[in-house]
Amino acid sequence: MKLSVIFTTYNSPEWLRKVLWGFSAQTDLDFEVVVADDGSGPETEAVIQAALAEGLSIQHIWQPDDGFNKCQILNKAIIAATGDYLIFTDGDCVPRRDFVAQHRLAMAPGHFLSGGYFKLSMPVSQALTREDVIEQRCFQSDWLTQGGMKKSLKSLKLSGSEFWQPWLNRLTPTKPTWNGHNASCFKADALAVNGFDQRLRYGGLDREFGERLVNAGLSPKQIRYSAVTVHLDHPRSYESAEGWAFNHAIRSQVRKEKITVTPAGIQQLAH
């Protein structure tokens, strides 16, 4: 089965380049990348063209810059995706080399997958080279410590140990939820809930999508120690208390009324 990896980007060509390095290093290469672009300039197109020239399968889905419209461009990417199974991550998340393979291994009807991510500092994010990604140094806790990052229990996500991964996935107290940095589902399930709610602003919009999947009968499956990305640091210019409150109100309604289909999703794109 062909998989589609979907992630958004907005005028972050250097971060996008690092993310695409990660996808070029995957052990499972039977996938396409769908870049959901919320209005970036020509620098982003140049990065994508360079990755295409190196053999990575990419669709570039672009819409004009009209403020924060992440959910709208995600819905356009879902429509364009040619895979029957969709992996969602972000344009600031570099995948470990087994990222696609782990999602393929764990996917199952009636479930969506909840993967993990490890936050990098800004200095480490900026210093990350192609060789660091290809050689997977950015997933080694000792290398990160040398770059100034402190060791923590969260570093266990990076190990890639086939022995420990399933145990850690079962033992973690963290509930599996839809995390926009690293989650996946069948395309049919995403379409059944009408995709992402285009009314939502920055903050928790991915969780709302997952809550509707649960309302529709899907069970979340934990793979946060199996499928891993490292998260590049960045400013959050769209974040606001008002936006979080607006989204929280919609999420509360979704949970209370067990809503499955958003009234402002894929089906409304053409209207």
Would you name each region that the model predicts?
Residues 181, 202-209:
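Acidic donor-binding loop at a coil-to-helix junction in glycosyltransferase catalytic cores
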Residues 86:
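Short aromatic/hydrophobic "clamp" motif used to bind/position activated sugar donors
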Residues 2-4, 32, 208:
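Cell-envelope/extracellular polymer assembly enzymes that use nucleotide-activated donors
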Residues 21-30:
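Short, acidic, metal-binding catalytic loop of nucleotide-sugar glycosyltransferases
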Residues 37-47, 93:
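A conserved acidic beta->alpha catalytic loop
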Residues 30-40, 59-64:
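Short beta-strand/loop segment that forms part of the nucleotide-sugar
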Residues 98-148:
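Conserved donor NDP-sugar-binding/catalytic core segment of glycosyltransferases
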Residues 64-81, 98:
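Glycine-rich, basic loop-to-helix element that forms the pyrophosphate-binding segment
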